[in-house]
Amino acid sequence: SVSEDLTHPVFSKLFVETEYLPESAALICGRRPRAPDEPRAWAVHVLSVDGRMQGPVEWETDRARFLGRGRGPEDPVALDGRPLSGTTGAVLDPIVSLRQRIRLAPGGFVRLSFSTGMVTTRESALAIAQKYHDPSAAARTFALAFTQTQGTLRHLGITSEEAQLFVNGESRGVKTK
């Protein structure tokens, strides 16, 4: 349960196993159930690259290796330029991090898209990873999300700037229809 996860976060993390899928540049994380009646949850994190890549995709699922000894999120060792470790499996404190070096010519264009989701089966996680590894699928999804957001804003009678005020918690002065 959520309350058990909050009470014992380290214990809860012991039930997460990570796996890298090279064919779709994705990490999937399966949370092993603690009880027979508990459903299994799967997270998927996938990278899509539209442009010229340089070298292989790198990944990290161990927070301690990502941060480094004595370092924190503001200055992780992962940003020092060294290759990521490629750790997977049952890690003590799981994260998902994908990295791809790119080559960008002067005036060139490269689009990197990261998609993250939660599903209830490994098969669904694999399907999402395969689908969103395709740059055109990621671009279509972002375009559809933008279109839906614009329709919602029109329906509410607010501008995108006013919507941003809501997101930032500054909604006192914004009135809708």
Segments (PLM) and residue ranges:
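Polysaccharide-binding surfaces and accessory modules of carbohydrate-active proteins
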Residues: 1-81, 123-156
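Edge strands and adjacent loops of beta-rich recognition modules
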Residues: 54-94, 162-177
